[in-house]
Amino acid sequence: MRAQPFTASVGYAGASVRADFIRRTYQHLAGAVLGFIVVEALLLQWSGARGLVRTMTGGHAWFIVLAAFMGVSWLAERWARSGASAQMQYAGLALYVVAEAVIFLPLLYIATYFSSPNVIPTAGIVTALLFGGLTYIAFTTRRDFSFLGSILSLGGFVALGVIIASLLFGFSLGVFFAGLMVAYAGGAILYNTSNIMHQYRPDQHVAAALALFASVALMFWYVLRIVMSLASDD
């Protein structure tokens, strides 16, 4: 007999079900981070990496990259939230991890070959500490941060508009914007961690892991930009 899918959120489930859901979510998050590292390392060692970076960053190609990434992200999240099959959910998570690795390639290529060797480890440690602190706050306070959803949606559209304007008119966003985006990513981590405790169904651990991974990746991107900027000023 086929198992019936969960219909109620994990917030209404028993303690053992919640604990199992949280454990599986963070296991899948760890797997996504590890997968990202492996794919990124392979891309950086690939002989065609330099040419791909030039193609991605030349002219208005970055618009195409961003549009493709947004489309892939939408598709991946839809697959990950699918209740049809576990295979489709895992396909969504894997697709998103690969897409993140590709869009990170230009930034990490520059950080690897043209910046201090300490910038990537430093950014990784800072991101991990911020993520750990925000996760601790969300789990210890047990507050429902779902109210952040509308704020994050509005902020995301504003940030996207600023990024597109910078690409069109060629101005640098600078460290201040990067700092604001780190704060935005922190809000997204609080929001998604709260959803893990209150909103997701017990069978949506893959989707929950994808949402957390997206927030962590966003934070790492802008923390790395800040660290690279500070390193270049030394």
PLM features: what roles do these ranges have?
Residues 1-234:
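A hydrophobic alpha-helical transmembrane-helix feature that marks the membrane cores
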